[in-house]
Amino acid sequence: MASMRTSSMSLLLLLSLVALVKAGVIIPQSPGCPPTEDKNFPQHVRVNLNIVNRSTNSRRPTDYHKRSTSPWTLHRNEDPERYPSVIWEAKCSHSGCINAEGKVDHHMNSVTIQQEILVLRRESQHCPHSFRLEKMLVAVGCTCVTPIVRHLA
């Protein structure tokens, strides 16, 4: 989870930097610069992918996936054509939820919690340093919900 959190934070910082540069907030634009709304404004920027602050000072329990009433396991999703190349995704351990006695209760449903993230996708194999932004839906955990019951009339 810490690796996934670090990757998510680095992408968030990267996207914030791109947005600030495009808006001209970080680098003041001289009067001769084209406005960002101009169709001739460049759609490409150079970004250094080295993360400045990889360590975080927050110490949180990392066993939520085991203690939850809807436990999950983490599976490695690896794609060398994507940055970050490794993203950890959750998979619910049961279709039902764990009750107070520690047994699976099939009157409740375990469902994944999904988060949309932005990743960098390699443009082509011929240009290894060229990436484009891509949305990706990632399962980050599971939760317990009441089932949807449909009554036939």
From Swiss-Prot:
Alphabetic keyword roster: Adaptive immunity, Cytokine, Disulfide bond, Glycoprotein, Immunity, Inflammatory response, Innate immunity, Secreted, Signal
Stored InterPro entries: Cystine-knot_cytokine, IL-17_chr, IL-17_fam
Signal peptide: 1-23
One GO MF term: protein homodimerization activity
Cross-referenced Pfam families: IL17
A Gene Ontology cellular-component term: extracellular space
GO biological process: adaptive immune response; cellular response to interleukin-1; defense response to fungus; defense response to Gram-negative bacterium; defense response to Gram-positive bacterium; fibroblast activation; gene expression; granulocyte migration
Intracellular or extracellular location(s): Secreted
Residues that carry a glycan: 53
Keyword GTP-binding: no
Gene3D superfamilies: Cystine-knot cytokines
Disulfide bond positions: 92-142, 97-144
Family recorded in the similarity comment: Belongs to the IL-17 family.
Function: Effector cytokine of innate and adaptive immune system involved in antimicrobial host defense and maintenance of tissue integrity. Signals via IL17RA-IL17RC heterodimeric receptor complex, triggering homotypic interaction of IL17RA and IL17RC chains with TRAF3IP2 adapter. This leads to downstream TRAF6-mediated activation of NF-kappa-B and MAPkinase pathways ultimately resulting in transcriptional activation of cytokines, chemokines, antimicrobial peptides and matrix metalloproteinases, with potential strong immune inflammation.
Entry protein name: Interleukin-17A
